[in-house]
Amino acid sequence: MCFEPIEETTFHSLLFKDAKICHKCFLKFKPKINKFNIGNVKGLYLYNYDEQVQNTLYQFKGCFDYELAGVFFDYFRLYLFLKYFGYVMVPAPSAKEADEERGFNHVVEMFKSLKLKMNCCVHKTTNVKQSDLSAKERENIKNNLKIDDVDFSKKKVLIVDDVYTTGSTVRAMIDLVKSKNPKKIKVLVMSKTKDIHEGV
């Protein structure tokens, strides 16, 4: 981040008046809206999980820099709000101990900037961090998740997460949400690793 004052007379400053970073810094994330599929569920991601995104995300959730909560969505906010208007966001849970240490749930705070309804109904049953698990162990993440007794019938649900790597968390969440009979399910992730094949 350049930390330079944002020019208030530019086109971008007028169109994105609530942006926390300038357009030049935003472009360093190399934004690109890409579609992918998880089974028969449609997903969308905004960035490849490259070094710039990784470092900024670490500064936000690892260094507790709360002011960075909305920077990934600043210039996508209106588009995403209109695209997913009427959906209820269900954020991926993180370890309770990690949330308590940083003072906030990073996924919740990140996606809160979209101004869509949110239901934090999926929880981890253990405090194991996914980053500490092997790829094989991550595939069994569904055994560490549970969903509240919610009724999603006639509702459209948007599952949201920060990074899509193996996809195990998202797939487990899809199964949990499906058990609550939603009208439709879609997935939105901030970033996605390159080594995951589309459609899996």
Predicted regions: what they are:
Residues 1-200:
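Glycine-rich phosphate/pyrophosphate-handling loop used in enzymes and phosphotransfer proteins
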